[in-house]
């Protein structure tokens, strides 16, 4: 039986792949669970169209990530103001959200806090730090920021 997978199936394939399976496995497991559809000419053409659209979207996402990385490289003064003691220790620590807000305040792009990769150990003192931003699987941006007393 020829099927088109709609979801990843272990030891069988990824979504969009056309696979040949035994009739019982297809009828009793894959089709009822919505993991596959019967391969017809129309379904194959539809899957090809979806794959082309996904490839085009991936290229656009990669180009957009590169543009954001360029904008981040142009940023100069990214300051994260925090409450500190007289000795320079922070009350708390600097979070990913603090960094994203500081980048936006410095004129950079608006970012999602989930892409921020904080340096090893928490930022607990004032000073200069560097953080990586995972903009895309193939694009990593870096931002230098200063933690200053508020």
From Swiss-Prot:
Q: Which SUPFAM superfamilies has this protein been placed in?
A: L9 N-domain-like (SSF55658), Ribosomal protein L9 C-domain (SSF55653)
Query: Which domain of life does the protein's organism represent?
Result: Bacteria
Q: Which UniProt keywords apply?
A: Ribonucleoprotein, Ribosomal protein, RNA-binding, rRNA-binding
Residues crossing the lipid bilayer are none
Q: Name one GO cellular component term.
A: ribosome
Q: Which GO terms describe its biological process?
A: translation
What InterPro entries does the annotation carry? Ribosomal_bL9, Ribosomal_bL9/RNase_H1_N, Ribosomal_bL9_bac/chp, Ribosomal_bL9_C, Ribosomal_bL9_C_sf, Ribosomal_bL9_N, Ribosomal_bL9_N_sf
Entry GO MF terms? rRNA binding; structural constituent of ribosome
Q: Does the keyword Nucleus apply?
A: no
- Family per record: Belongs to the bacterial ribosomal protein bL9 family.
Supply the PANTHER family for this chain.
50S RIBOSOMAL PROTEIN L9
UniProt function note:
Binds to the 23S rRNA.
Instruction: Write the protein's name.
Output: Large ribosomal subunit protein bL9
Q: Which organism is it from?
A: Corynebacterium aurimucosum (strain ATCC 700975 / DSM 44827 / CIP 107346 / CN-1) (Corynebacterium nigricans)
Upper classification of the source organism reads: Bacteria, Bacillati, Actinomycetota, Actinomycetes, Mycobacteriales
Q: Which gene encodes it?
A: rplI
